[in-house]
């Protein structure tokens, strides 16, 4: 049986993740409050951020930036802003 959560990002009841993907308190918060669909959306945004801003995950400052953006995206209804990016639907 699938574990259901009320997703804070999508504001609906949806299937939760099978296990905690991020360590620590933030990971617990994500596991308890974010659904699979919202996590998949975040992973796409995360990839864009890493590529467009040329982030190096070995750099602590870059990891901190990515974590801040993740928290804004998942819990504060923020969206990832990438300078010069125009979504395909707006071209």
Swiss-Prot record:
Pfam families: Iron_traffic. Signal peptide: none annotated. Keywords: Iron. InterPro entries: Fe_traffick_prot_YggX, Fe_traffick_prot_YggX_sf. GO terms for cellular component: cytosol. GO terms for biological process: cellular response to oxidative stress. GO terms for molecular function: iron ion binding. Transmembrane segments: none annotated. The keyword Iron applies. It comes from the Bacteria. Belongs to the Fe(2+)-trafficking protein family. Could be a mediator in iron transactions between iron acquisition and iron-requiring processes, such as synthesis and/or repair of Fe-S clusters in biosynthetic enzymes. This is Probable Fe(2+)-trafficking protein. It comes from Tolumonas auensis (strain DSM 9187 / NBRC 110442 / TA 4).
């Amino acid at each position: 049986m699938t574990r259901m959560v009320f997703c804070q990002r999508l504001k609906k009841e949806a299937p939760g993740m099978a296990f905690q993907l991020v360590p620590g308190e933030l990971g617990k918060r994500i596991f308890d409050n974010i659904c699979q669909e919202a996590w998949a959306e975040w992973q796409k945004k995360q990839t864009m951020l890493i590529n467009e801003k040329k982030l190096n995950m070995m750099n602590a400052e870059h990891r901190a930036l990515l974590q801040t953006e993740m928290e804004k995206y998942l819990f504060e209804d923020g969206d990832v802003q990438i300078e010069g990016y125009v979504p395909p639907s707006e071209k």
